Swiss-Prot record:
PANTHER family: UPF0178 PROTEIN YAII. Belongs to the UPF0178 family. This is UPF0178 protein CA_C2825. It comes from the Bacteria. NCBIfam families: PRK00124.1. It comes from Clostridium acetobutylicum (strain ATCC 824 / DSM 792 / JCM 1419 / IAM 19013 / LMG 5710 / NBRC 13948 / NRRL B-527 / VKM B-1787 / 2291 / W).
Length: 148
């Protein structure tokens, strides 16, 4: 098992690294040239800037049984297709029985935004320590499930 993180603006990198180091699981952080990452534990792969370049690089690296941390539903769907596990930074697991619905909801929301004359969107709410705890608990459960 290896862990791959879509690390562009990912708020859970430090949690992933801490848990992975504790469990002796290798981590690869992938980001584009617009981000600077430093790590004493993880392998860092900087991918040339370009639409979805990091996403495709991550999918090319992952294999069955690996864990992918991403907030991108498309990346999660491709990871599941390769037999990898996928988890959102919120702690929500992407699974074969929920990914189609999530992709459809994303599509509908995108169409609604395009059709609306009001294009202002509120950003996500501020991340809390409870969010981090929820992610860590789900991440640990996922790793244990993958090790069985």
């Amino acid at each position: 098992m290896k862990i791959y993180v879509d690390a562009d603006a990912c708020p859970v990198v430090s949690i992933v690294e801490r848990v992975a180091q504790e469990m002796k699981i290798p981590v690869t952080l992938l980001c584009d040239t617009n981000h600077i990452l430093n790590s004493t534990y993880s392998d860092i792969k900087i991918i040339g800037a370009g639409a979805d370049a990091v996403d495709f690089a991550l999918i090319n690296l992952c294999h069955r049984g690996d864990v992918v941390v991403t907030q991108d539903y498309g990346v999660a769907a491709m990871a599941l297709g390769k037999g990898a596990y996928a988890i959102h930074q919120s702690g929500k697991l992407y699974e074969n029985d929920n990914i189609d619905r999530m992709l459809m909801e994303r599509h509908i929301a995108k169409k609604a935004r395009r059709a609306s004359s009001k294009n202002h969107m509120k950003g996500p709410r501020k991340r809390t320590s409870e969010d981090d705890e929820r992610f860590e608990a789900a991440f640990r459960r996922l790793i244990m499930r993958g090790k069985v």
